[in-house]
């Protein structure tokens, strides 16, 4: 398998099990670090040209507005090509029940014919939401993994099991 890890992650003020906490590295990026350690796969971070606010409450309102508008936020960059990869591990936080709209910007930019997407979603209790069904509009999707963001630092064994169950490692 030749896979690329593509991810969207947000640092700054985040919600952790009922409380706000400032983090320098987002939960999804921490999970991606575990995947990279376990697989050695390359990764690509999706970053918006105009990022969401560092303030959590403002961020969720901005994300909600993007969802309502079906926006496709401009990204600083996209991978040059996905041709060398047969699989994409797509990691993201659950924003309003689906992927962040910046992830849709990525999905819209490529043809996923012949590729398989493995979704990994960080959240604080909302699970995968409808993200898997939304991604299926673009690509063949295998079993996704929902991780509670506040526990992701210790989730390497769970991630390893998911990778093994999907025959990624």
Which residue ranges define each predicted feature?
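N-terminal beta1-alpha1-beta2 submodule of the flavodoxin-like/Rossmannoid cofactor-binding fold
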Residues: 1-87, 97-98, 104, 157-169
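Short beta-strand elements in bilobed, periplasmic/extracellular small-molecule ligand-binding domains
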Residues: 42-44, 139-148
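Short, conserved loop/helix-junction motifs that constitute active-site signature segments
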Residues: 82, 108-114
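Short, well-ordered alpha-helix to beta-strand connector turns
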Residues: 85-86, 114, 139
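Glycine-rich, N-terminal phosphate-binding loop of Rossmann-like dinucleotide-binding domains
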Residues: 92-93
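Glycine-rich, charge-decorated loop segments at or immediately adjacent to ligand/cofactor-binding or catalytic sites
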Residues: 125-138
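Short, charged, surface-exposed secondary-structure boundary motifs
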Residues: 129, 151-156
């Amino acid at each position: 398998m030749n896979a690329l890890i593509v991810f969207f992650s947000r640092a700054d003020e985040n919600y952790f099990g009922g409380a706000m906490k400032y983090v320098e590295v987002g939960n999804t990026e921490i999970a991606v670090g575990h995947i990279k350690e376990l697989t050695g796969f390359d990764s690509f971070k999706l970053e918006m040209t105009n990022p969401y606010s560092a303030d959590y409450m403002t961020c969720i309102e901005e994300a909600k507005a993007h969802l309502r508008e079906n926006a496709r936020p401009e990204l600083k960059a996209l991978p040059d090509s996905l041709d060398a990869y047969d699989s994409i591990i797509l990691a993201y936080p659950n924003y309003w029940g689906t992927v962040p709209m910046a992830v849709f910007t990525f999905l819209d930019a490529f043809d996923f014919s012949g590729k398989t997407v493995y979704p990994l979603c960080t959240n604080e209790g909302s699970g995968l939401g409808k993200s898997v069904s939304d991604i299926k509009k673009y690509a063949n999707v295998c079993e996704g993994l929902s991780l509670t963001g506040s526990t992701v630092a210790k989730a390497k064994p769970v991630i390893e099991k998911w990778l093994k169950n999907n025959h990624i490692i």
